[in-house]
Swiss-Prot record:
<feature type="transmembrane region" description="Helical">
    <location>
        <begin position="70"/>
        <end position="90"/>
    </location>
</feature>
<comment type="similarity">
    <text>Belongs to the binding-protein-dependent transport system permease family. CysTW subfamily.</text>
</comment>
<feature type="transmembrane region" description="Helical">
    <location>
        <begin position="323"/>
        <end position="343"/>
    </location>
</feature>
<feature type="topological domain" description="Cytoplasmic">
    <location>
        <begin position="202"/>
        <end position="224"/>
    </location>
</feature>
<keyword id="KW-0812">Transmembrane</keyword>
<dbReference type="GO" id="GO:0055085">
    <property type="term" value="P:transmembrane transport"/>
</dbReference>
<feature type="topological domain" description="Cytoplasmic">
    <location>
        <begin position="1"/>
        <end position="5"/>
    </location>
</feature>
<keyword id="KW-0997">Cell inner membrane</keyword>
<feature type="topological domain" description="Cytoplasmic">
    <location>
        <begin position="128"/>
        <end position="137"/>
    </location>
</feature>
<protein>
    <recommendedName>
        <fullName>Glycine betaine uptake system permease protein YehY</fullName>
    </recommendedName>
</protein>
<dbReference type="GO" id="GO:0016020">
    <property type="term" value="C:membrane"/>
</dbReference>
<comment type="subunit">
    <text>The complex is composed of two ATP-binding proteins (YehX), two transmembrane proteins (YehW and YehY) and a solute-binding protein (YehZ).</text>
</comment>
<feature type="topological domain" description="Cytoplasmic">
    <location>
        <begin position="269"/>
        <end position="322"/>
    </location>
</feature>
<keyword id="KW-0472">Membrane</keyword>
<feature type="transmembrane region" description="Helical">
    <location>
        <begin position="181"/>
        <end position="201"/>
    </location>
</feature>
<feature type="topological domain" description="Periplasmic">
    <location>
        <begin position="27"/>
        <end position="44"/>
    </location>
</feature>
<dbReference type="GO" id="GO:0006865">
    <property type="term" value="P:amino acid transport"/>
</dbReference>
């Protein structure tokens, strides 16, 4: 008797995507401040119901194809669905813009967001099954964005309300990007300068680890908004006592308290990553290095540091992603960044303006995480070789 094995993950994603097709694909509103009316795919293009049925049948068939061939088919179909969703959203916005007023806005609906997320999850699951090599996985993930980026730069998506917000605020967006990157690297670099030596010191001075980690744990538990607020008064008093600090850009609000707070939040993962990375090295390895005649400095530079590097990079990845997200809150004290767009959108009830600030933050976090994943995986491959 022949048994068919089905890919349960792909089948579940297919079911959820079918449910997403029943939700509004886009939302159409007469202006940016009014709640939009949901439009389904079959309302926009009645003939698309047959395309959806065809794609669903092909996707279902891929669930039963065994091995790598099935995964490749699943990747192609899921990527096709994602590209089709992006292209369809742009075409729907253009179609509605031709029939509506210049103030009308076409936003992405819940059906689009859910279906796109599920298609990307299906792509990720298929890539995981296709290859185990980190570089190939990374390249397969990156190629998913090629066609959507081409659609973006070709102008296909220009009539979406999100793109209209970008066109109206391009200078503000560029400034926000520069400020957000300044917050990111301006916090991570000093944190590295402080955290790495502090972690090494804690490793060699185990008696002091408890006090250091207790202090850093307390800092980590303070809510970000509270810590930003606590730094305003001392910094303002410092600038009042020493006015020349103001010429250096130091103030009670703005970048200075934001950078100090972000550095403080970054210290615990970095210090702990250094200590854990050095502690996980087997003692047999250190004894072998000592037996070879290596000095303490040589053992640290040529044995301990390379072996601890993957663990440290994982901690640095956490810090980078954490800082990308927390920099959004820094806009509350005038530090700028994408958080300024988010809070402006919330205050004016403009969801598309909120998305204009949120989406780049998500993209930065995902890219940062992907780059560190690739680097860590390549280090493991090199070590195994």
């Amino acid at each position: 008797m022949t048994y068919f094995r089905i890919n349960p993950v792909l089948a579940l994603l297919l079911l959820l995507t079918a449910i997403a097709a029943a939700l509004p694909f886009i939302s159409y509103a007469p202006n940016r401040l009014v709640s939009g009316e949901g439009r389904h795919l079959w309302q926009l293009w009645p003939q698309t119901i047959w395309m959806l049925v065809g794609v669903g049948c092909a996707w279902l068939t891929a669930c039963f194809i065994p091995g790598k061939k099935g995964s490749i088919c699943a990747l192609i179909l899921a990527q096709f669905v994602f590209v089709l969703l992006v292209w369809g959203a742009g075409k729907a916005a253009t179609q509605l813009a031709q029939n509506g007023s210049a103030l009308a806005r076409t936003s992405l609906g819940s059906g689009f967001w859910l279906a796109a997320a599920l298609a990307l999850l299906a792509c990720s699951d298929a890539i995981r099954r296709i290859s185990t090599h980190p570089l190939w996985r990374w390249l397969l993930h990156m190629q998913i964005a090629i066609i959507p980026l081409w659609l973006l730069y070709s102008g296909t998506l220009n009539d979406l309300s999100l793109m209209k917000e970008y066109a109206n605020r391009q200078d503000v967006f560029d400034d926000a990007l520069a400020q957000h990157l300044t917050l990111l690297f301006g916090a991570v670099l000093p944190a590295l300068v402080i955290g790495v030596p502090l972690g090494i010191w804690c490793y060699f001075s185990t008696a002091r680890q408890g006090a250091i980690f207790s202090l850093l744990n307390v800092i980590q538990t303070v809510p970000s908004v509270a810590l930003f607020g606590l730094l305003i008064a001392p910094l303002a008093a410092l600038v009042t006592a020493f006015p020349w600090l103001g010429t250096l850009g130091i103030a009670g609000t703005g970048m200075t308290p934001a950078l100090i707070a972000l550095v403080l939040y970054a210290l615990l993962p970095l210090v702990r990553g250094v200590v854990v990375g050095l502690n996980q090295i087997p003692r047999d390895v250190l004894e072998s290095a000592r037996a070879m005649g290596m000095s303490g400095a040589q053992r640290f530079l040529h044995v301990q540091l390379p072996l601890a590097l993957p663990v440290f990079l994982r901690s640095l990845r956490v810090v980078m992603v954490q800082t990308v997200g927390m920099a959004v809150i820094a806009a509350l004290i005038g530090a700028g960044g994408f958080g300024a767009l988010v809070f402006q959108g919330l205050l004016s009830s403009a969801i598309d303006l909120v998305l204009l600030g949120v989406i780049p933050v998500i993209v930065l976090a995902v890219l940062t995480d992907a780059l560190f994943d690739l680097l860590i995986a390549l280090l493991k491959v090199k070590r195994n070789d």
